[in-house]
Amino acid sequence: MNPVSLLSLSGERRSANWKPSSWDSNQIHQSLKSDFNDLQEKWHTELKQAVEQMLEAVAEPLQKLTLIDDIQRLGVAYRFEKQIDDALSSIYSNYAAEVSSKKDLLAASLYFRLLRQHGCYVSPDIFIQFKDEAGQFKASLGDDVEGLLSLYEASYLGIKGETILDDAKAFSTSTLENLMPHVEADIASRISHALHLPLHWNMRRMEARLYIDVYRENKKRRNDNLLEFARLDFNMLQVIHQRDLKDVSFWWDFLDLPRKLGFIRDRLMESFIFSVGLNFEPQFSECRKAATKDILLITVLDDIYDIYGSMDEVEIFNNAVNRWDLGAVDELPEYMQLCYLGLLNSVNELAYVTMKDTGRNVLDFLKKLWKRHFNAAVKESRWFHRQYTPTLEEYMENAQISIGAPLVLTHAYVKMLKYMPNEDVNHVDKYLKLISMMCYVFRLYDDWGTSKAEIERGDVPKAIQCYMHEAKVSEEIAREHIKNIINERWKELNEECLKATDLNRKFVAAVLDALRAAAFFYHDRDGFGEPDHKFKSQAMALFSQQV
């Protein structure tokens, strides 16, 4: 069918002039041919046992912390959860006094970061010993590059009111920036990578792929069994991820929306990378596939609401969603009918599979989520057509819903239920505060990377423009304000995670990982809407090139 036949051509249409996808289905299927044979699987199992024995055998606390840090950064900590839990709990109970008296910046920073990541409160006063009489971090710390890098990473686990960690972040950042021209190339590369995006904010799968190479070159620190296990595990997961991506690719090809609706973003690979960022572990294939479908549908409908659709059409579509009635399809413009049917079919399929797998009926719950999302989206359309600029607070109250992340996360929760036996869809309320806090920062990341281009092509003012209008300031000042909000909101998230002792740790990790995926895409670019050559290289490293 010619795409024009599905498009309403009455009236002037806005266009984002999106670049076509740099991936087509043939390219995806041809490039995803990794293999993992029985011999490799046997070797993987034997190496896993060797790493477990190594975790048991290492007694010295700093050595054990260093080993745990390597295991986490190599992306294989999920294979050793109980051993790591036991080790960190023991260190937390027995090592505090020792680490506070050693005056070892690397040890103190590593202890602080790993224990806080684990949900244990460690006082930031552990860093007082590294300050001079004037209350400044000692200049001599500049001689300890590894300690500085560790301090820098630890500072991002701070919560509100911990000024010593704000000082640590400022000191370590400026000192590392000054050191970069004077250190060896491999160390300068590590510093540059950390300063670009700290470990706590970075997408774990991307970090793992990079760290395998870093760890391989670090002959003083490297353990060959751990390196080989991480390499095999990465390749094993890559095969699973390839299978997931192929499955979603067939579904996307079947819908054929990019051809039928020529104005939309075709972002299959980008959507899948986000889903892997959200949940990379092997058992969560169905979660990844559902999240990818969600993101693709949200993106299509976002392009209709924000760019292509007239206000009348958007209102009609929104009414149809609120009715959630198959019969409403006949009232929609022809180009919207396929989107509406795709939405209903996708949600009904998710509800059906969840009922089959868990016995839980989640259909009403899912419908409520989608209605909430579209009601927020239509409000932004009304703002645009009325040329209304909301205050930053008013904008964010709505935009943290319209971003779509609440939908993706709650769908992820539903898909994870069969792996969380003590959880139920009725329990999701206890996660809403954490999800809401995450979505607030997610929206700010998105606006940070996309707002300039979106305003140029005609869209509702974003967070930066809302603050510029409200405070009568320049874009530079507004961006600095948004950057500060992101930093402060991360602190609030850190604190909420420390309190979240009654929440499922797998899902809490998924919430934070969704935000890390947002940081990956939007920290310094619009990596989703306008992916560049670097993005394609990163995607190939994750899904096509074996280690």
UniProtKB/Swiss-Prot annotation:
For binding Mg(2+) 1, which residues are annotated in this chain's numbering? D302, D306
Query: Does the record bear Membrane in its keywords?
Result: no
Q: What pathway does the annotation place this protein in? A: Secondary metabolite biosynthesis; terpenoid biosynthesis
**Where in the cell does this protein reside?**
Cytoplasm
The principal localisation class reads cytoplasm
The residues that the entry says bind (2E,6E)-farnesyl diphosphate are: R265, D302, D306, R443, D446
Report keywords, A-Z.
Cytoplasm, Lyase, Magnesium, Metal-binding
GO biological-process terms attached to the record: diterpenoid biosynthetic process
Cofactor(s) it depends on: Mg(2+)
Q: Which GO terms describe its cellular component?
A: cytoplasm
- Reactions catalysed according to its record: (2E,6E)-farnesyl diphosphate = (1S,5S,6R)-alpha-bergamotene + diphosphate
Give the residue range of the signal peptide.
Answer: none
Locus of motif DDXXD motif: 302-306
Entry keyword annotation includes Nucleotide-binding: no
What GO annotations for molecular function exist for this entry?
A: magnesium ion binding; terpene synthase activity
Q: Which residues bind Mg(2+) 2?
A: D302, D306
Q: How does it assemble?
A: Monomer.
**Family (UniProt):** Belongs to the terpene synthase family. Tpsb subfamily.
Q: What does this protein do?
A: Sesquiterpene synthase involved in the biosynthesis of volatile organic compounds. Mediates the conversion of (2E,6E)-farnesyl diphosphate (FPP) into alpha-bergamotene. Does not use (2E)-geranyl diphosphate (GPP) as substrate.
What is the official name of this protein in its record?
Sesquiterpene synthase TPS3
Organism whose genome encodes this protein: Cananga odorata
